[in-house]
């Protein structure tokens, strides 16, 4: 519970840092990839249900499309589709990419979807579904994106951005560089982003911040114990204590912004 006028540090991690924390959790703590994926999917499903509630839609009156890539981010979306179906929501999946290229964890979730009988449409074979959806889950790319988006992926992203349904992004909106916030050719314009474990830098750097919508950091089992492999290199601040800072004048400068005292030292030396 936050105390009055408290200012709290929040970790902002790079893709490389997040991979290290994820690996530590799997190898040293013993939490399997599928468990982390299930918890990420639960957080996504919860966010979808909140959006449906805000729109005054009952689960059986809603229709959700989970747009999934072939990596673990896509696996989060596949698992989310199953969890939404369990809650009575009509849910479909659009797979972008060949199912033969699914990661091991995503392929595991895909097999479960088949057993559930949930509709999975291949964009390469069938194109984008000509339907309206209450909510669209963006699970195309996660923090591992390192190239410009072209081809089918670009077409899918631009189609989603033109649709009226609300968009929930898994971890980070597809097309946003998770370190810099830059757009990799095109990007999902999300209404909500559920980021997993720790917040990503690109969600708070522009233009990425303007694409993320409302950001929520979900606890999926990756804790600060993983910082034993290396502390995050960047933090931001949160808490109601931030209200103590005055708004800057539009025509302000360093002479009018005020003064600050920094007490600093090196670790183990001060």
Which sequence ranges carry the predicted segments?
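Short gly/ser/thr-rich secondary-structure transition/capping motifs
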Residues: 117-124, 150, 174-178, 240-246
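Short, well-ordered turn and helix-capping elements at secondary-structure junctions
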Residues: 124, 180, 264-266
């Amino acid at each position: 519970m936050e105390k009055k006028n408290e200012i709290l540090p929040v970790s902002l991690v790079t893709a490389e840092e997040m991979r290290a924390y994820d690996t530590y959790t799997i190898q040293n703590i013993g939490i399997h990839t599928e468990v982390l994926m299930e918890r990420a999917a639960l957080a996504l499903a919860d966010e979808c249900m909140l959006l449906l509630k805000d729109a005054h839609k009952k689960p059986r009156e809603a229709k959700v499309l989970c747009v999934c890539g072939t990596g673990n981010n896509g696996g989060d979306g596949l698992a989310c589709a199953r969890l939404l179906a369990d809650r009575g929501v009509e849910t479909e999946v659009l797979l972008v990419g060949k199912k033969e290229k699914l990661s091991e964890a995503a392929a595991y979730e895909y097999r479960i979807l088949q057993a559930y009988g949930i509709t999975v449409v291949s964009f390469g074979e069938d194109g984008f579904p000509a339907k309206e959806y209450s909510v669209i889950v963006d699970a195309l790319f996660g923090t591992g994106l390192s190239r410009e988006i072209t081809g089918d992926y670009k077409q899918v992203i631009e189609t989603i951005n033109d649709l009226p349904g609300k968009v929930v992004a898994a971890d980070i909106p597809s097309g946003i560089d998770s370190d810099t916030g830059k757009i990799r050719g095109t990007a999902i314009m999300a209404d909500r982003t559920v980021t997993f474990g720790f917040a990503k830098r690109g969600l708070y750097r522009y233009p990425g911040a303007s694409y993320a919508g409302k950001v929520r950091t979900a606890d999926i089992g990756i804790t600060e114990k993983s910082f034993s492999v290396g502390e995050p290199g960047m933090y931001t601040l949160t808490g109601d204590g931030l209200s103590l800072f005055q708004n800057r004048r539009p025509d302000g400068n360093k002479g009018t912004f005020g003064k600050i005292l920094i007490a600093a030292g090196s670790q183990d030396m001060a």
